Amino acid sequence: MSGERAKRFPLALEDLKREPRKPEGRVAERQAAGDAARQRLTAAAAVPAAASPIVPERRAPHGGVFAAKPARAKQHAPAAPGAAKRAPQGGAKQGDRSAAPNVALSGALALTSERVRERMVERLRANGVADPRVLAAMSAVPRHMFVDPGLAAQAYEDAALPIGHQQTISKPSVVARMIELAAAGRALERVLEIGTGCGYQAAVLSRVARDVYSIERVKPLYERAKLNLRPLRVPNIRLHYGDGRVGLPAAAPFDAIVIAAAGLDVPRALLEQLAIGGRLVAPVGEQAGEQVLTLVERVAPAQWRESRLDRVFFVPLKSGVI
């Protein structure tokens, strides 16, 4: 074969003679292809039965399978309303799911706080507190926010609780009684509190009077009261660090003065800062002896009337600051 012919016909004679052997390979390939086709047909025949349950899943975004997750979240919602609001943001993140119990616990504590405050108010009403303003104020102010976390469970019991520095938060019944005596059904403009403590009584007073001035002689308690009152955003309380026995002559006269510590007598400076017709409520007596809740009314520029009422027990009224 010439070179030119080889270029036009690259197959040699030997190649043409071997060609008849290849049909066997093609038959085998066709047989293999047929087997594969039959297997695909067999698999295809089985697919509809296995795939049929998957069809609803493709429609799930419109309320199918994925609706189960919101449904489970709604089952938990009554116990923790706050947690239910946060559930859509949780997704599949582990951190969000682990935070949910804390949110639920906080919501439960808030609800419990409201319920126990209402029960506390019912006890106050049963014990003779009748002024609706005082009852509403006692119901509104969260006492557990003014005590140590370890004592929060006892916050709505009728008990005095320690707040540090040898001081206490007064019993709810005593707080309500003193404020009711000071108000006597009147509209209070200016009220002076001696002994801020943790700030609880000042918060209650702020819902009964237009302006509340409160003095604390213990600097750490003064700072603590500011921190306790800050979340409540009470606009009409003015806290002062100073000697409560001196009062606040610059802000006088006061319609009412409430003293949250017991002295052997009522300081003369405080009597002078009481407005005509004003009322002062204070425990009077010795620390180791009998203390009596005393009401003093200023009936004239140089005349006061005193009434001795209930037996009580308070921390001592001291002068100076620390």
Curated annotation (Swiss-Prot):
Biased composition regions of type Basic and acidic residues, renumbered to the chain: 14-29
EC identifiers of the protein: 2.1.1.77
The keyword Cytoplasm is annotated on this UniProt entry: yes
GO molecular function terms noted in the UniProt entry: protein-L-isoaspartate (D-aspartate) O-methyltransferase activity
Protein's GO biological process: methylation; protein modification process; protein repair
Annotated compartments: Cytoplasm
Disulphide bridges, residue numbers: none
Chain intervals for the UniProt region annotation (Disordered): 1-101
Active site feature: S170
Catalytic activity: [protein]-L-isoaspartate + S-adenosyl-L-methionine = [protein]-L-isoaspartate alpha-methyl ester + S-adenosyl-L-homocysteine
Major localization class: cytoplasm
InterPro entries: PCMT (IPR000682), SAM-dependent_MTases_sf (IPR029063)
Origin superkingdom: Bacteria
PROSITE patterns tied to this protein: PCMT (PS01279)
Family label: Belongs to the methyltransferase superfamily. L-isoaspartyl/D-aspartyl protein methyltransferase family.
Role noted for this protein: Catalyzes the methyl esterification of L-isoaspartyl residues in peptides and proteins that result from spontaneous decomposition of normal L-aspartyl and L-asparaginyl residues. It plays a role in the repair and/or degradation of damaged proteins.
This protein's name: Protein-L-isoaspartate O-methyltransferase
Name of the gene: pcm
